[in-house]
Amino acid sequence: LAATLYQKTNGGIQAVAVNTLGVLYVVEKGGDTVQSMADLKGRTILSTGKGTTPEYVLRYLLNANGIDPDKDVTIEYYSEATEVTAQMANTDNAIAVLPQPYVTAAGLQDDTLRVALNLTEEWDKVADTQLITGVTVVRKEYAEAHPDVVAAFLADYAKSVDAANTDLDGTAALCEEQGVVAKAAIAKKALPNCNIVCLTGDELKADASAYLQVLYDADPAAVGGALPGDDFYWTAE
């Protein structure tokens, strides 16, 4: 999405940090028929994120495992993860692609749900890049005018990420307080699987550019039709 926005704004935004690595899972209700990507062939898959990371990652992984996402499976897209979980509740033997923390929340509400596949692990089997789910962006005009503010933000951001990953109780309480999840208990259980990071500078460029190259090679539309230029990656002067 960030790469597409970069194209649509004629380079008007910059990525300042990778904030989330892989958080996508295949969840199965009431069975254990899905043990590998190959087991998805012929099935209906509920998913969020049409036109964003979940769609592109799922399609890439299906193709990499010899499954045509347009012919060999039926993918039903929903705008929100909560819609997917609601549909699963009303569908026997449902299969869905969900991100954390919704995987954890859904599992706590329905003990017949199980994590069938960790899509980060599936990605690692077929790609030589990190699976990236989210980046933090800034308007290029603002970053050029206020580089010190951006640098200060990133320093505070790194501290916040460290706290989120080490102080689970405090972070979980904040998640409930700010309405990120309904209950702190859900957040505390989900946080270790949320892959929250703060990758900046050379690490940001190396990981994000390699990931975008994989998406571009699979489908140029996934990154807005062209790979972003070097100016997409913000670095401190």
Give names to the regions the model predicted.
Residues A143-A218:
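Secondary-structure end/capping motifs
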Residues L1-D70, E76, V97-Q100, R114-N118:
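Short, glycine-/small- and polar/acidic-enriched structural segments
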Residues S209-E237:
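Conserved C-terminal helix/tail region of periplasmic/extracytoplasmic solute-binding proteins
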Residues L1, T82-L174:
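Pocket-lining segment of extracytoplasmic ligand-binding domains
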Residues G12, N63-S79, E83, N90-N93, ...:
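A local structural motif
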Residues Y6-T9, K41-T44, G49, L62-G66, ...:
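Sec/Tat-exported extracytoplasmic proteins
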Residues V18, D32, M37, L46-P54, ...:
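Extracytoplasmic/periplasmic, Sec-exported soluble proteins
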